[in-house]
A protein has these predicted regions:
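Active-site-adjacent pocket-lining segments in enzyme domains
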Residues: 32-36, 41-51, 56-117
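Flexible gly/pro-rich beta->alpha loop and the following alpha-helix that scaffold active-site loops
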Residues: 2-49
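Short intrinsically disordered, low-complexity coil segments enriched in acidic
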Residues: 1-4, 103-105
C-alpha cells in the first residue's frame, strides 16, 4: 500500500490510480471550490472507497449546515444526505427546512457513518 498526498498538478491522475480516497477537514468552502474545478470528480471517485471528515463530509453531501459558515450550503451531492458535522444538538431545524427526500446525518465529533452507493 502506498500513501500519496494529492497535488493540484497531478490530482486527476492520482484519483484515477487510487482505490481509497480520504478527504480531510479544514476550510470547507475552499475545499469545495477547489474540487469543483475537477468537473468529473463524481465520476472519478465512483466505485472507490472514499472517506470524508468534517469539510470532507460536507463536500460529499448534497446539503450541509456548518456553524462556522452559519447557513446552509450545497455540497457536491455525491451522497444523497444532508449533514451537520460536530453536531451538538443545535441547528437541526436548518436541515429540517429543506429537502425532505434526503437522509439527515447528525455527526458528533468522532462519530462516523458508512454509506454504500
Amino acid at each position: 500500500m502506498e500513501y500519496v498526498l494529492a497535488t493540484r498538478d497531478n490530482f486527476i491522475e492520482q484519483i484515477k490510480k487510487s482505490d481509497i480516497i480520504y478527504i480531510h477537514g479544514g476550510e470547507t468552502m475552499n475545499l469545495i471550490n477547489e474540487i469543483k474545478k475537477c468537473a468529473d470528480f463524481a465520476l472519478l471517485v465512483k466505485g472507490k472507497v472514499i472517506a470524508g471528515e468534517s469539510a470532507g463530509s460536507y463536500l460529499l453531501s448534497s446539503i450541509f449546515y456548518s456553524k462556522t459558515i452559519g447557513h446552509l450550503e450545497e455540497g457536491l451531492g455525491i451522497l444523497p444526505i444532508k449533514v451537520i458535522c460536530h453536531f451538538a444538538g443545535l441547528h437541526v431545524e436548518k436541515l429540517d427546512s429543506i429537502r425532505g427526500d434526503l437522509e439527515k446525518a447528525l455527526l458528533k465529533d468522532y462519530q462516523y457513518k458508512v454509506y454504500s452507493l
